[in-house]
């Protein structure tokens, strides 16, 4: 292999690393490509020791970013906050004894990490929780209900995505051109037509600067409270052609981070994809040990979004069919079993349900 070929492979390998999206393992990741728009990405490579998962964005033109949404596992109610302990047990913390702190991308309750995500999202939750601590019980109840309604507002998430699509048009065009300049024009100039090398380098650098300027403008519109993050990202894009190619990734990744996955799915998914995601999220909310108050409010709002898409929520709570020989199923993940058992081997849910209508799976016993 020639030196030019080796250099090309090294640069392309670095570019592939740039295409990796690092998220919390509990995040839901959507693709925004022309062919797979709204498709939920299958589970990425999970690094359990680092509490991180890796998802690969489409590296080749037409470039498309990934959309990440991460709903917090902590559950708020007017009297307390419910979190999961190290062994999955529920722990309740009263508002009077709750101490909320943050460390970078982590949110902590009384020193225990309860959420890891986008720094802007963590800051927003920290401010919300501080306000709730100082509120009276009626005020707290109204504020939590408002927060849940906003998180399940599919129209608001759709509007935010539309703003991104409209404002990022030039970024999407120029970043695809930058891919061509860096991986086709520049190697051609180096290996075949050296007289083009200086103009090619100038073109790559100028394109990175243009993308950085446009990124600053769009980011300021979409993320008004993240000046430090905006400066760092703009500086990186201006100096690194590889980062410049993935400018849309930086803009889009946390665009709807504060919205529930069902609200985002309702805004971008096909009917079939939405049904799968909505059913998964509805079952998780309904059959996960939780504060009764929080569970009732969250499930009610999820069901409302499902009905707005013309689906009946109850139909998403049972398997579409009963597999041959199966007598039980898990109401949370719909895994079916041929023998009696006490808990689901896939998700750990303990209250398995017996089929009561042979071959249909449409009826269940609570």
Labelled PLM ranges:
Residues 67, 195, 199-211, 219, ...:
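Composition-driven recognition of long, C-terminal low-complexity regions enriched in serine/threonine
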Residues 33-41, 72, 76, 83, ...:
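Intrinsically disordered, low-complexity segments enriched in charged and polar residues
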Residues 127-158:
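Short, charged cytosolic
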Residues 17-43, 210-237:
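Transmembrane-cytosolic junction motif
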Residues 59-125, 129, 230-366:
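Charged, low-complexity cytosol-facing tails and large interhelical loops of integral membrane proteins
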Residues 1-12, 173-179, 184-210:
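Hydrophobic alpha-helical transmembrane segments
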Residues 64, 154-182:
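Loop-to-transmembrane boundary segments
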Residues 23-79, 88:
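Membrane-interface amphipathic/juxtamembrane segments adjacent to transmembrane helices
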């Amino acid at each position: 292999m020639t030196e030019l070929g080796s250099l090309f492979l090294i640069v392309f390998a670095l570019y592939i690393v740039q295409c990796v999206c690092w998220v919390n393992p509990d995040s839901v990741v959507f693709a925004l490509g022309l062919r797979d728009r709204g498709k939920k990405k299958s589970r990425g490579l999970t690094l359990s020791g680092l509490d991180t998962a890796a998802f690969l964005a489409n590296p080749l033109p037409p470039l498309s970013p990934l959309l990440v949404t991460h709903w917090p596992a902590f559950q708020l109610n007017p009297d307390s906050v419910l979190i999961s302990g190290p062994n999955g047990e529920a722990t309740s913390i009263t508002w009077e004894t709750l101490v909320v702190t943050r460390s970078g991308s982590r949110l902590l309750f009384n020193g225990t990490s309860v959420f890891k995500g986008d720094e802007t999202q963590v800051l927003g939750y920290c401010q919300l929780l501080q306000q709730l601590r100082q509120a009276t019980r009626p005020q707290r109840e109204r504020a939590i209900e408002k927060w849940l309604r906003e998180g399940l507002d599919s129209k608001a998430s759709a509007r935010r995505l539309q703003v991104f699509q409209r404002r990022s048009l030039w970024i999407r065009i120029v970043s695809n051109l930058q891919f061509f300049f860096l991986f086709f024009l520049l190697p051609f100039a180096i290996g075949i037509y050296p007289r083009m090398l200086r103009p090619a380098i100038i073109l790559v650098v100028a394109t990175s600067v243009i993308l950085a300027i446009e990124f600053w403008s769009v980011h300021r519109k979409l993320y008004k409270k993240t000046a430090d993050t905006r400066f760092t990202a703009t500086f990186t894009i201006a100096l690194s052609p590889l980062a410049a190619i993935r400018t849309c990734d930086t803009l889009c990744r946390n665009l709807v981070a504060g919205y529930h996955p069902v609200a985002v799915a309702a805004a971008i998914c096909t009917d079939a994809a939405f049904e799968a995601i909505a059913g998964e999220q509805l079952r998780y909310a309904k059959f996960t040990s939780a504060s009764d108050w929080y569970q009732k409010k969250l499930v009610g709002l999820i069901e409302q979004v499902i009905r707005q898409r013309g689906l009946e929520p109850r139909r998403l709570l049972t398997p579409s069919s009963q597999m041959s020989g199966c007598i039980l199923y898990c109401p949370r993940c719909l895994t079916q079993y041929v023998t009696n058992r006490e808990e689901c081997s896939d998700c750990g849910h303990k209250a398995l349900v017996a089929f009561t209508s042979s071959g249909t799976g449409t009826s269940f016993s609570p």
